[in-house]
């Protein structure tokens, strides 16, 4: 199942990330908040990667969780992204976070990004991937 930000539900509860700009709140599913990458860390990573020359293609996060890191990459690099999340509630939260970041004035590439509910360890040979994000803080996920 694939989710797009245009279909996101923003009505659920949100939590403010103290490192995010004023008014930018995020959705989390169940116990996902303690695992979420803080916005400031996500943006700094994206700024570092933005300095690199990447080939054409998407940003792929095969274990996207709340989607905050994926949203930061797409926002800062102006690239479409695909996040894959095994847990359905967390995937819906990630999709809502893509829309929230897009609505906060970041790059429109977020609107073209999507979240897939599924197993990120199963490759999709149709994707042209410019960058694969694997969170170094969670090497076993």
Regions picked out by a protein language model, each given a short descriptive name:
Residues 80-85:
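Conserved SAM-binding motif I beta-strand of class I
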Residues 1-57, 87-126:
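S-adenosyl-L-methionine
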Residues 44-52, 72, 97-100, 104:
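A generic secondary-structure signal
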Residues 128-129, 133-141:
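S-adenosylmethionine
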């Amino acid at each position: 199942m694939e989710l797009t930000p245009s279909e996101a539900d923003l009505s659920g509860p949100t939590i403010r990330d103290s490192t995010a700009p004023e008014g930018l709140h995020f959705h989390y599913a169940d116990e996902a908040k303690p695992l979420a990458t803080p916005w400031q860390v996500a943006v700094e990573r994206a700024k570092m990667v933005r300095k690199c020359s990447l080939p054409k293609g998407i940003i792929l996060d095969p274990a996207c969780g709340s989607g905050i890191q994926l949203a930061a990459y797409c926002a800062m690099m102006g690239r479409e992204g695909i996040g894959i999340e095994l847990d359905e509630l967390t995937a819906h939260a990630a999709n809502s976070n893509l829309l929230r970041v897009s609505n906060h004035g970041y790059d429109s590439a977020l609107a073209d990004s999507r979240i897939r509910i599924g197993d990120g360890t199963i490759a999709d040979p149709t994707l042209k991937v410019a960058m694969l994000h694997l969170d170094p803080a969670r090497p076993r996920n």
